[in-house]
């Protein structure tokens, strides 16, 4: 130890006598022997810091001190000594004596005596005051007066700058000289002109900072499902696009294997994380421009040949707003044939609320593979990321109507399945057999036709567009399941539920926010929440639903033509008969009412 210490000292050029006082006191045994006493400088004794002297400490009064207790009226009197000639008052007796000299009255000034003057102390007349005790009496008449004014009197003087009041005029004058000239700045940036206000505010800020240090509430500590649209709040495009769907805090944690098998499955059980896990910032692309999509591959068949393409769905796109209606519909109708994670192949597998657990569904449901070969896993939405643990489609972006990772994050609340928007049933994919697309469309049309009669001949109020969308995805998701299904099905058979966006036919109906071209004769009371009514009607190869609709329209047209022909024929017959009556003179000619209704007798 000594050798290492000496070597270190020689290396750094420190002498041995200078190194001795650097060692701790408990290492004296290992330290080298101290130098001779004449080399040590005596350390100065540590002086304790002087204690602050307290003012007006309680003490035993002098036995010879005169204790004077004045009344409040006497203390507050401004003129105690009054001249008997002119009734002028003075505060001091000396001033009165000098005044008497002007009246040629005998006057006498107090002379300083060589004898020791008896000390006087004054008590505060307020019983609750600490200076009411003789041991705390004040030894100055002016001091006791100012004390009584400040603590127990009325504050008559007011500062014009800060509105602070003072009871003593001298205090008010001193404050007026410094008010507004000095500023007190807090660490938070607040400025104060008064020191007392600054001290109070700074104490509050310090307490708040300590409380915040004990309980941090930063935004990064919150779960990511509180921000379903990503945490880039400075991007105006993300802010505008995030208003499209107000989806937050939907669903409770359920079993990962449970997936709803409804006709319109708006979200199913998602995995808790895996190879295809993505943050919620992938929901909306940075260049997303509202309802319009990018126009990269206008051909649908070319779209199928690309396995690694960008998001071209409803919410992902560039700033290319001006698109043709055909390209707009093609972008909406794009779905890939490479969807290997065989989720339940429902008609509208709208899993934009949460991803499906593609691993369990692919391994436990053998019918899903066959159904996926017919409908490519789903009819409208491609489920490339249809789960956090998806097997296939990991390299592709979403090309469906909505990106599948709308609610995906590491802390997503949809660790289980989310309740469906149109049904509250939570069932396993194996609980019900899969139906074909044609059968499901026919079933949906039958369910929608039951409530379509109540919605004829009325328009949708444009002011309720945004609120109805939010209600449909928010508060109404649990209480209006069945009615929402029927209302959405009604939009399939409603030809007037499409809007017009700057000359482009929008399939979102009256919920696009710009449906200015709707007329009163169109049936727009049905609520097309997802805008799939026009898309389904324009789909090719959708089974017997389109043919059935065309047949119904043809039958209605034939009935209308038949009725018009009968009316024309009956009106012509009535005209001939009336002319015959006039020519033959067989009675007064009867005028034929419209639609061939006769009242003439032959």
From Swiss-Prot:
Region annotated SHR-binding, chain positions: 194-206
One GO biological process term: regulation of DNA-templated transcription
GO molecular function, one term: DNA-binding transcription factor activity
Keyword annotations: Activator, Chloroplast, DNA-binding, Metal-binding, Phosphoprotein, Plastid, Repeat, Transcription, Transcription regulation, Transit peptide, Zinc, Zinc-finger
UniProt note on tissues of expression: Highly expressed in leaf tissues.
InterPro entries attached to this UniProt entry: C2CH-3rd_BIRD-IDD, C2CH-4th_BIRD-IDD, C2H2-2nd_BIRD-IDD, IDD1-16, Znf_C2H2_sf, Znf_C2H2_type
UniProt name for this protein: Protein indeterminate-domain 5, chloroplastic
Species this chain originates from: Arabidopsis thaliana
């Amino acid at each position: 130890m000594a050798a290492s210490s000496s070597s270190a000292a020689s290396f750094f050029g420190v002498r041995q006598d200078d190194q001795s006082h650097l060692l701790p006191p408990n290492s004296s045994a290992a330290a080298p022997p101290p130098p001779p006493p004449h080399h040590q400088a005596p350390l100065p004794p540590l002086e304790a810091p002087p204690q602050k002297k307290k003012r007006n400490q309680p003490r035993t009064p002098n036995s010879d001190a005169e204790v004077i207790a004045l009344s409040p009226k006497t203390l507050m009197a401004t003129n105690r000594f009054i001249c008997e000639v002119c009734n002028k008052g003075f505060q001091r007796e000396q001033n009165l004596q000098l005044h008497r000299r002007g009246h040629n009255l005998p006057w006498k000034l107090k002379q300083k005596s060589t004898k020791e003057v008896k000390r006087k102390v004054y008590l505060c007349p307020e019983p609750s005051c600490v200076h009411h005790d003789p041991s705390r009496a004040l030894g100055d008449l002016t001091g006791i007066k100012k004390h009584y004014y400040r603590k127990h009197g009325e504050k008559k003087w007011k500062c014009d700058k800060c509105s602070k009041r003072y009871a003593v005029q001298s205090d008010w004058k001193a404050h007026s000289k410094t008010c507004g000239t000095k500023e007190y700045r807090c660490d938070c940036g607040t400025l104060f002109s008064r020191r007392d206000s600054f001290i109070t505010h700074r104490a509050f800020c310090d307490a708040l900072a300590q409380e915040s240090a004990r309980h941090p509430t930063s935004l990064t500590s919150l779960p990511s499902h509180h921000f379903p649209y990503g945490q880039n709040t400075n991007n105006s495009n993300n802010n505008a696009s995030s208003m499209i769907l107000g989806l937050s805090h939907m669903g409770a944690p359920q079993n990962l294997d449970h997936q709803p098998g409804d006709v319109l499955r708006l979200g199913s059980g998602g995995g808790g994380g895996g190879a295809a896990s993505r943050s919620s910032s992938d929901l909306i692309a940075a260049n997303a421009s509202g309802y319009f999509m990018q126009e990269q591959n206008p051909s649908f068949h070319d779209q199928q040949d690309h396995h690694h393409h960008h998001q071209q769905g409803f919410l992902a796109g560039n700033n290319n707003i001006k698109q043709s209606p055909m390209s707009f519909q093609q972008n909406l109708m794009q779905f890939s044939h490479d969807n290997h994670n065989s989720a339940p192949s429902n008609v509208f597998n709208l899993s934009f609320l949460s991803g499906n657990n593609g691993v369990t569904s692919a391994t436990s449901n053998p019918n899903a593979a066959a159904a996926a070969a017919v409908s490519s896993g789903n009819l409208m939405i491609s489920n490339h990321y249809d789960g956090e643990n998806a097997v296939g489609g990991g390299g592709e972006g979403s090309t469906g109507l909505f990106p599948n990772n709308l609610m995906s994050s590491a802390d997503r609340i949809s660790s289980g399945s989310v309740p469906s928007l149109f049904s509250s049933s939570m069932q396993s994919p194996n609980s019900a057999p899969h139906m074909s697309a044609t059968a499901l469309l026919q079933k949906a049309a039958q369910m929608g036709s039951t409530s379509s009669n109540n919605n004829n001949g009325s328009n949708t109020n444009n002011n309720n567009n945004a609120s109805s969308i939010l209600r449909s995805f928010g508060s109404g998701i649990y209480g209006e399941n069945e009615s929402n299904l029927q209302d959405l099905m009604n939009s399939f058979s409603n030809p007037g539920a499409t809007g017009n966006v700057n000359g482009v036919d929008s399939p979102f109906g009256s919920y696009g926010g710009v449906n200015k071209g709707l007329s009163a004769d169109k049936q727009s009371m049905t609520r097309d929440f997802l805008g799939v009514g026009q898309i389904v009607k324009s789909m090719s190869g959708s089974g017997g639903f389109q043919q059935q609709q065309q047949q119904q329209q043809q039958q209605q047209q034939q009935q209308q033509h038949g009725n018009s022909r009968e009316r024309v024929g009956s009106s012509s017959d009535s005209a001939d008969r009336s002319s015959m009556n006039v020519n033959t003179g067989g009675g007064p000619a009867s005028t034929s009412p419209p639609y061939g209704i006769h009242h003439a007798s032959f």
